[in-house]
From Swiss-Prot:
PROSITE patterns: BPL_LPL_CATALYTIC. Its EC number is 6.3.1.20. Pathway: Protein modification; protein lipoylation via exogenous pathway; protein N(6)-(lipoyl)lysine from lipoate: step 1/2; Protein modification; protein lipoylation via exogenous pathway; protein N(6)-(lipoyl)lysine from lipoate: step 2/2. Monomer. This is Lipoate-protein ligase A. CDD domains: LplA (cd16443). The lineage of its organism: Bacteria, Pseudomonadati, Pseudomonadota, Gammaproteobacteria, Enterobacterales. Keywords: ATP-binding, Cytoplasm, Ligase, Nucleotide-binding. It is an enzyme of class 6 (ligase). The keyword ATP-binding applies. Residues 29-217 form the BPL/LPL catalytic domain.
Amino acid sequence: MCSLRLLLSDSYDPWFNLSLEEYIYKNIPKKQSILFLWRNQNTVVIGRAQNAWKECNTRRMERDGIKLARRNSGGGAVFHDLGNTCFTFISTQEHYDKSISSNIVLNGLSYIGIKAIISGRNDIVIRTENGEHRKISGSAYRETSGRKFHHGTLLLHVDIDKLDYYLNPDFKKLETKGITSIRSRVANLNELKPGINHQEVCLGLTEAFFQHYGMKVKPEILSTDNFCKIPEFFKQFNKQSDWNWNFGSAPAFTHQLDTRFDWGSVTLHCDIERGIIHRSHIFTDSLDPSPLEILAKKLVGIPYNNKSILCCCKEWMQSWPQYKKELSEVSHWLIKTIS
């Protein structure tokens, strides 16, 4: 006999929700199936093997207060806001696979009057009025030690402009070994059903979940108050919210950037591993390359973010007061470009 749980998060914090998801996954008992429903506010979520700098515009995100969250599953980068419903199916049933949860999602949408189909391995699509298939859901699957995990998103009324705005990185010369997101043509469910909301979708998914298992359970509301004192959860949350996980876990990559100032051209070549600059070289045709050669050495060993670059440049500029204007231009350029 399989037991069921229906879990609802009252938090919009992506680090909390992803930590909660991981905690539930690691602690689910045998012969249990769980549906966890949640939402994130203004977040870019990237896959476990992705490079944040390649997938999204980190400078815009930092300026606008958009969080970055790296999940523990694979897949591509997605933008979340409150027009997005997240679902997670977790099970320790012996014969469980993602086709079960995928069909629950399709049936849940059908209950609220939306016809959708599976496309490829991980996507759910709808057919628009002009006959075009558009993606409304992407998902990822993982399995370890008898525990199965399938999570994904449903686009209800996501701000598509923000999706494009934050998921389009700056034009940078990046070479990376990470997994690159494949941009798909997406659609919001409110194009088919105006006024659709999170509560309505959750009711549809819940009904399909109960229908599949032939039983009903009361929903459990999960909040930060329930979990903040649990050491295992707290450890997971610290990891999930840490720069070293969200940015530093990126695969090794190379960043080359160049520009021209009135006094000469500058090309910076950096090799980054786990979010740290491991090698740096600057090429320039300036009449005195010495300050830039010193800067290249100072960049080695610091985190690849604009705060660290700013601290490095401030210290560096103090050693060359005679070049204050030129070095200020270089500093401003680096801080603006590396973010």
